[in-house]
């Protein structure tokens, strides 16, 4: 900063291209903006995200979407996972089907917000039991974030669906049992043998939150 030469200082403000940053809102203006955010921004994100998935597939040849499935059509037990845990869960599902004839599949959640509620309900309806895998701990919370979204979606679909939110119709007999599963706490890896043991327990019904 001192001497014969100085580093160039970034031009924070360009008078030829003025931009308003960090504007202050009065209470009334802020309330109106918050109310307008949902119809003019939030409700458009899902469609924009689908278009991004389409363009990504067009450029790379790899198909992605809000959810992904693996051997789910005839499965009665489902492992719900996000991120890299999907690969481990798919490997376990392949092993259990091949070696133990267990009717198990995997549902991958690729975006938590906006939550793909209709797709999740459509793929979980009629299943016997669902293990929701989450890499976190949720002290003092009744449900962890992903499990809460799934249960809320199933409950809304159980209320005869919603034409506005496009929830599919769900009968009480089609409602799966959900099991909360936390893994990776303290940096522990997600092991295939743990998922195999979890799948055997899942067939007996849900219980308190399990830690892998």
Per-region residue spans from a language model:
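Short glycine/threonine-rich loop-to-helix capping motif typified by GTGT followed
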Residues: 83, 91-94, 115-125, 144, ...
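Terminal amphipathic helices with adjacent charged low-complexity linkers/tails
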Residues: 1-19, 124-149, 154-155
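Short helix-loop-beta junction
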Residues: 51, 59, 91-106, 156
